[in-house]
Regions:
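Nucleic-acid endonuclease domains
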Residues: 1-66, 74-133
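Acidic/His-rich structured neighborhood in mature extracellular/periplasmic domains
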Residues: 70
Length: 133
């Protein structure tokens, strides 16, 4: 089955619910937001690939879901991502030209079993026409 925008949004909510209950040993003690973001992006992409067919993005293309014209961002609720997605003044004024699916998480470490948990508080879709500053 091909991945649709509706599927992406519904699956993001379900993935967030499941991931918020998952204890992950590889994230224990990790404070690098980029590492957490990479982990979550890859896990969500793999989750979707088990259920749907879609074109996966790459660094050269710049967006994670090219067929849907959507990029994925992951940010901490405690320390929101400070990187700017705009590559030009035009994008800042008129928008990125693509939509975003944004996961907002709060990470907790559990020393007793050396795991971490990402409580995903929001999985938000932002339409392309809403991505301007």
């Amino acid at each position: 089955m091909n991945l649709s925008l509706s599927d992406l949004c519904n699956e993001a909510r379900e993935f967030s619910r499941q991931e918020s209950l998952h204890n992950e040993p590889t994230l224990f003690g990790v404070t690098d937001g980029k590492a957490v973001g990479t982990y979550l992006e890859q896990k969500f992409r793999d989750y979707l690939l088990e259920r749907y067919q879609f074109e996966t993005g790459n660094s050269a293309r710049g967006i994670d879901f090219p067929s849907l014209n959507i990029d994925m961002k992951v940010t901490s609720a405690r320390q929101p991502q400070s990187s700017c997605p705009f590559r030009s003044a035009r994008q800042k004024v008129y928008g990125l030209g693509y939509g975003l699916i944004v996961f907002v998480y709060d990470k907790s470490d559990y020393p007793e079993n050396r795991t971490a948990r990402l409580n995903i508080s929001n999985a938000i879709y932002i339409a392309p026409d809403r991505t301007a500053d």
